[in-house]
């Protein structure tokens, strides 16, 4: 064998002695098709077997580009097949020939040999759990690195995270002596070629679980320590606590455990109590408050004899409420404040109810548009849902109370002069109006009417009697002065005035019953005919002894006419008093409605502020208080 090697070397040197260049070795360009060239190393004992492997590899080169180099490397094998022939070398450039002729030590197949030695199917079985003795558990260390919170799905109650897992265990079958393998400390093996613990996400919320895993090669060290690093997009189920939404804190758990092995076979542990946040990317909707890792040992009811270790990654998040405040709460507050304009609008316009109903419809349409963003759960009502319902209820109550105030405003005309109750005048128009800083000032006409009613409507009658007495006294003075004249006669106006005064006084003094309208019209027509005949004929009664009969008839008829005139004036006065009284009553009801409307306006504003404070501010500020939690759980 040594003689063959020597002859082959001499042949190669004689073939290339005319090439004016230096020769250099070339490294193999395809690392995946590494070949055992240990036959060239005199340190290997089993050189014959390795030579056969190298010869087999030589016969099947990987590509045409490396064919020449491969032929050059495996020249001993070729010489063994063609011992008497010299391989003709084609013409190459200087650099390629230099690299092709540096063979010894250029390619080291130790790692590949180690790979084949470790994963030989006669020695290693990937479906068998690694352990020194079958009664001993395999200790698996679990590490979790949170990279990003991708999404929180409130409707489906699922959390999507992008994470990196670091799983480590000991496999004695994958250990080697570094001194025998060129001081190789670690190699990388595809994860599908070795045994791996069947650790899965227990609370997985996606069907294609393994499709989201991005696994890399497994690193194996010389002492049998196996490290498996891989990235995954986990979608885990997370019960959403919607009580304080959108000012809520969420705590989601990712539970990892072995699906097939209990604690007697795989002992799952943690490499640290805190999760790794060194590569965390901030989320636009949630702030990460804290992340902890906890190891728990549970016993399932179906298998009480076995304990199962579970790694719980607990993620504590706080929602950023700025988006919900500007897009959900502020518009609702503005729509609710529009109901205030319904209280300030005058009732005479007839648009109070239309204004409130328009606000109510706007609130309903807005709530319909944002319903999709509220988590659909029946375990609790969120704060924003309570606020929406409270705002809608207050707008409905504002519509009802505006109907009441409108009816109160028209109560005087509708009830045909029904007086305001005394207690309402005292408490509402009196104390409440003063408390609400409202000045109730009566018009001048109503003030005069109240003054006349306080004297029982005697002002006009007493003034008439006073005027008639003054006229009678003046007529008596004139009569006495005229009696001293020679003819002892006077014109018709003096006796007429005298008769007029006496008739009016007798009518006022008499307690006569009022006549109906037809009788007054008939008597007035007959008396008007008589007076017209007297005026047209120029019949003027004079005071004398011969005219007593004419004067008596004239006095009787004129007295009757005066009665009718007085009764007409009296009825007109009564009608005016009734209309004035109704105006006063209607004014009182209007003032009562104004005071009540102002009171309801203050109550509505107070209720709106109270709702905002109690449902949106206080629960957020005192969310950790037990009394506040019990108060909210009441709803």
Curated annotation (Swiss-Prot):
Disulphide-bridged cysteine pairs: 238-252
Localisation: Postsynaptic cell membrane; Cell membrane
Residues of this chain annotated as glycosylated in UniProt: 46, 139, 177, 225, 282, 625
Pfam families hit by this protein: Neur_chan_LBD, Neur_chan_memb
Topology, Extracellular side: 25-324
Cellular component terms (Gene Ontology): neuron projection; plasma membrane; postsynaptic membrane; synapse; transmembrane transporter complex
Gene Ontology MF terms in the entry: acetylcholine-gated monoatomic cation-selective channel activity; excitatory extracellular ligand-gated monoatomic ion channel activity; transmembrane signaling receptor activity; transmitter-gated monoatomic ion channel activity involved in regulation of postsynaptic membrane potential
Superkingdom, taxonomy of origin: Eukaryota
GO biological process assignments: chemical synaptic transmission; monoatomic ion transmembrane transport; regulation of membrane potential
UniProt similarity note: Belongs to the ligand-gated ion channel (TC 1.A.9) family.
Job description of the protein: Possible acetylcholine receptor.
Cited NCBIfam families: LIC
Family annotation (PANTHER family): NEUROTRANSMITTER GATED ION CHANNEL
Protein name as catalogued: Ligand-gated ion channel 4
């Amino acid at each position: 064998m040594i003689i063959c090697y020597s002859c082959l070397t001499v042949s190669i040197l004689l073939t290339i002695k005319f090439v004016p260049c230096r020769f250099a070795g070339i490294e193999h360009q395809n690392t995946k098709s590494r070949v055992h060239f240990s036959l060239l190393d005199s340190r290997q004992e089993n050189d014959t077997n390795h030579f056969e492997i190298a010869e087999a590899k030589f016969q099947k080169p990987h590509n045409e580009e490396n064919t020449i180099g491969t032929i050059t490397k495996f020249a001993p094998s070729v010489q063994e097949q063609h011992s008497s022939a010299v391989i003709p070398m084609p013409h190459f450039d200087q650099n390629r020939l230099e690299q092709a002729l540096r063979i010894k030590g250029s390619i080291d197949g130790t790692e590949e040999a180690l790979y084949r030695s470790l994963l030989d199917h006669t020695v290693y079985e990937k479906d068998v759990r690694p352990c020194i003795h079958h009664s001993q558990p395999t200790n698996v260390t679990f590490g979790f690195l949170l990279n990003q919170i991708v999404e929180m799905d409130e409707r489906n109650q699922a959390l999507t995270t992008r994470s990196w897992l670091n799983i480590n265990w000991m496999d004695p079958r994958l250990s080697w002596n570094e001194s025998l393998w060129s001081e190789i400390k670690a190699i990388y093996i595809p994860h599908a070629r070795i045994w791996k613990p069947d650790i899965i996400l227990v609370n997985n919320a996606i069907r294609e679980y393994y499709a989201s895993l991005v696994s890399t090669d497994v690193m194996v060290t010389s002492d049998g320590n196996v490290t498996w690093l891989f990235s995954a997009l986990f979608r885990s189920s997370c019960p959403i606590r919607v009580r304080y939404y959108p000012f809520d804190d969420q705590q989601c758990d990712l539970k990892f455990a072995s699906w097939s092995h209990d604690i007697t076979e795989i002992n799952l542990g943690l490499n640290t109590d805190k999760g790794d946040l060194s590569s965390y990317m901030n989320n636009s909707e949630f702030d990460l408050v804290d992340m902890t890792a906890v190891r728990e040992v549970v016993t399932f009811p179906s298998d009480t004899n076995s304990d199962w270790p579970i790694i719980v990654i607990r993620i504590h998040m706080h929602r950023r409420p700025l988006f919900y405040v500007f897009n959900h709460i502020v518009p609702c507050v503005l729509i609710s404040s529009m109901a205030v304009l319904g209280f300030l609008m005058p009732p005479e316009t007839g648009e109070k109810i239309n204004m409130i109903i328009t606000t109510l419809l706007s609130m309903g349409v807005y709530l319909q548009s944002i319903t999709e963003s509220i988590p659909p759960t029946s375990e609790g009502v969120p704060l924003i849902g309570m606020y929406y319902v409270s705002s809608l209820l207050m707008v409905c109550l504002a519509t009802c109370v505006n109907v009441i105030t409108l009816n109160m405003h028209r109560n005087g005309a509708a009830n045909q002069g029904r007086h305001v109750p005394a207690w309402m005048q005292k408490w509402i128009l009196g104390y409440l109006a003063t408390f609400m800083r409202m000045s109730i000032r009566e018009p001048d006409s109503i003030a005069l009417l109240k003054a006349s009613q306080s004297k029982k409507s005697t002002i006009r009658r007493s003034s008439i009697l006073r005027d008639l007495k003054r006229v009678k006294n003046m007529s008596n003075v004139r009569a006495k002065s005229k009696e001293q004249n020679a003819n002892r006669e006077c014109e018709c106006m003096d006796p007429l005035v005298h008769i007029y005064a006496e008739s009016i006084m007798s009518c006022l003094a008499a307690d006569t019953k009022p006549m109906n309208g037809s009788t007054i019209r008939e008597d007035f027509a007959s008396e008007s005919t008589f007076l017209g005949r007297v005026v047209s004929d120029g019949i003027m009664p004079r005071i004398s002894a011969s005219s007593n009969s004419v004067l008596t008839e004239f006095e009787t008829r004129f007295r009757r006419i005066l009665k009718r005139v007085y009764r007409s004036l009296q009825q007109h006065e009564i009608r005016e008093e009734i209309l004035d009284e109704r105006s006063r009553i209607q004014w009182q009801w209007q003032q009562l409605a104004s005071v009540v409307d102002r009171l309801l306006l203050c109550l509505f504003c107070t209720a709106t502020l109270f709702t905002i404070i109690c449902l949106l501010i206080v629960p957020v500020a005192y969310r950790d208080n037990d009394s506040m939690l019990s108060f909210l759980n009441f709803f």
